[in-house]
């Protein structure tokens, strides 16, 4: 199973990069122990279109080409999505890791949100918080929760009840 994070925009702030890379390295160390053969980060350039809806649609068109739709589970992050506790998030991830698909995609739209087309291909829409998070903070927060969930799955002491 491949686990992928697809995001509109690139991390350019060194403080975010440092924290993001910390969790990325930790995930790579343990991913094979839970059946993840590859962990990939896919960054899509933001569209320069002036119209918000057109911009989101253009970003979707680039992003969807990076997804193997028939053989993937697509989890969209959206502030209106379902909220999870850490244990519920771990259970969702564990469920999808046992599906007969080749990849799980966590998708973060651009700063203006996600197009309706992107929302339609999502198998699940989740929210990391009831609060609005900055785009880059959402990425870091997702990476931490992925690492935490994977740690729970292998009984690593990172997560404490």
Q: What are the functions of these language-model segments?
A:
Residues 2-6, 40-42, 105:
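A structural signal for isolated positions on well-ordered beta-strands in alpha/beta enzyme cores
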Residues 11, 79-82, 110-113:
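Short glycine-rich anion-binding loops that position phosphate/pyrophosphate groups of nucleotides
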Residues 36-103:
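S-adenosyl-L-methionine/SAH cofactor-binding core of RNA-modifying enzymes
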Residues 112, 116-160:
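Structured adenosyl-cofactor binding patch, chiefly the S-adenosyl-L-methionine
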Residues 17, 53, 86-90, 119, ...:
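Conserved strand-to-helix beginnings and helix N-cap segments that scaffold or border functional pockets
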Residues 1-31:
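N-terminal beta1-alpha1 ligand-phosphate binding loop
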Residues 98-107, 129-135:
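Short, acidic/small-residue loops that bind anionic groups at enzyme active sites
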Residues 5, 75, 109, 142:
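Conserved RecA-like P-loop NTPase ATPase core
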